[in-house]
Amino acid sequence: MSEFWLISAPGDKENLQALERMNNVTSKSNLSHNTKFAIPDFKVGTLDSLVGLSDELGKLDTFAESLIKRMAQSVVEVMEDSKGKAHETLLANGVDLTSFVTHFEWDMAKYPAKQPLVSVVDTLAKQLAQIETDLKSRTAAYSVLKANLENLEKRSTGNLFTRTLSDIVSKEDFVLDSEYLITLLVIVPKSSFAQWQKTYESLSDMVVPRSTKLIAEDNEGGLFTVTLFRKVIEDFKVKAKENKFIVREFYYDEKEIKREREEMTRLLSDKKQQYPTSCVALKKGSATYRDHKVKVAPLGNPARPAAGQTDRDRESEGEGEGPLLRWLKVNFSEAFIAWIHIKALRVFVESVLRYGLPVNFQAVLLQPHKKSATKRLREVLNSVFRHLDEVAAASILDASVEIPGLQLSNQDYFPYVYFHIDLSLLD
């Protein structure tokens, strides 16, 4: 199970014996795997300050857990074609999350225990707040790129009726800057190629002879050029439609074509450079700007690499990790580590508030073996530590008993200090 129970009991002889009894029972009954959870000695300060820290740490705990879950989900979104590998990506200090929790050691360099508790908590809060700020800005940029790439895919796929033509046509395909002549693009069904060649000149008056040329085709038809006088455009469209030849509304604008091509190149470059491991929009097997499925006639070569693109560049496209995924991996680790440190702080603060001074308690990490055993495990703990708070222990059995001064519901209160750690971050 990816669930842990972090508990503590007083460190006197009687309660250490109780912990030993708990270990024996849970081991023999195969209820949980238990390990000591080392927490350093902190500067306690006043009890009033601990009460305030208890509330602050509770909020920080909730915030940290929410943050790492959002980061885990972001990893899944970036690795759209590798969701099964997301768990392998979510590490803490280079190890899997379970190993990190079960072998937890307080990071003295990052969070010095000699500092006042308030300072340690403040350091953790600022660290997590900065990670969240960066996460928001980076995922917002990712979402914009994803939306733009999805739009690009829509424009770069589909049939000749709907797809962009900027990557198909060239200036040489058109008669431009003529007062009298214009070049139209006509979509002809595959079965009617021969008919088009025989009849296009006679569909209307003033069609330039031998002016047609096939510039692209897909599975359904072909895209032909035809040049005619401007004055017969409407007549030609009507006659063409009668013969199931459809004039595509397209007029060559060199500036617009250049702008669209540059936009496509930029988006694909952003996708490759920023998120090479993600399939943010251009899924495997779908058409793309550089590698579309439309077969282009000799006027252009779609297989030709973009300017400055080497064979190595093309072979390595999609390999490696982009900045977003690298950032997520590094900062997920940092946020997760901070979260477990917060859990340790909560155990320390609650143990001092519960068991008093001088500081003397033992924290233990329990990993239930299976979900069905958690009820029995809870019964064992309540029985072993019942003596710590007879009123609270009784109230567990009698929900009508109110515990004076206790803000939690009785179902959330136990005679021992207890915090839950759930590593099911992607569920």
UniProtKB/Swiss-Prot annotation:
Entries under SUPFAM superfamilies matching the protein: Vacuolar ATP synthase subunit C
Tissue specificity comment: Predominantly expressed in the lung and kidney. Isoform 1 is lung-specific while isoform 3 is a kidney-specific isoform. Isoform 1 is localized in the lamellar bodies of type II alveolar cells. Isoform 2 is strongly expressed in the cortical and medulla collecting ducts and is found in the plasma membranes of renal alpha and beta intercalated cells.
Record-linked InterPro entries: ATPase_V1-cplx_csu, Vac_ATP_synth_c_sf
Keyword Transport in record: yes
GO molecular function: identical protein binding; proton-transporting ATPase activity, rotational mechanism
Cross-referenced Pfam families: V-ATPase_C
Positions of region (Disordered): 298-320
Keywords recorded for this protein, A-Z: Hydrogen ion transport, Ion transport, Transport
One GO process term, biological-process aspect: positive regulation of Wnt signaling pathway
A cellular component term, taken from the record's GO annotations: proton-transporting V-type ATPase, V1 domain
Top-level taxon: Eukaryota
Assembly, per entry: V-ATPase is a heteromultimeric enzyme made up of two complexes: the ATP-hydrolytic V1 complex and the proton translocation V0 complex. The V1 complex consists of three catalytic AB heterodimers that form a heterohexamer, three peripheral stalks each consisting of EG heterodimers, one central rotor including subunits D and F, and the regulatory subunits C and H. The proton translocation complex V0 consists of the proton transport subunit a, a ring of proteolipid subunits c9c'', rotary subunit d, subunits e and f, and the accessory subunits ATP6AP1/Ac45 and ATP6AP2/PRR.
Function: Subunit of the V1 complex of vacuolar(H+)-ATPase (V-ATPase), a multisubunit enzyme composed of a peripheral complex (V1) that hydrolyzes ATP and a membrane integral complex (V0) that translocates protons. V-ATPase is responsible for acidifying and maintaining the pH of intracellular compartments and in some cell types, is targeted to the plasma membrane, where it is responsible for acidifying the extracellular environment. Subunit C is necessary for the assembly of the catalytic sector of the enzyme and is likely to have a specific function in its catalytic activity.
Family: Belongs to the V-ATPase C subunit family.
Designated name of the protein: V-type proton ATPase subunit C 2
The organism of origin for this protein: Mus musculus
